[in-house]
Amino acid sequence: MHYIQRKDGRDLETVDEFTTAKEARAMLHEYRTADPSAVYYMSRRPCKHWKE
């Protein structure tokens, strides 16, 4: 799985998950365009609260 993480100041959260890296990269661009105030990046692991 591939995850998109959002980091804003001290806060970190997983915002989406994808089965392919290609799909995740395409959506990563969309997230970065829609919200330039935060840092978005891809990760192979979700944050610890993602599954709850």
Regions found by a protein language model. Name each.
Residues 22:
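Acidic phosphotransfer microenvironment of two-component signaling modules
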Residues 1-8:
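A short beta-strand micro-motif
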Residues 12-15, 25, 29-52:
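Short, mixed-charge low-complexity intrinsically disordered segments
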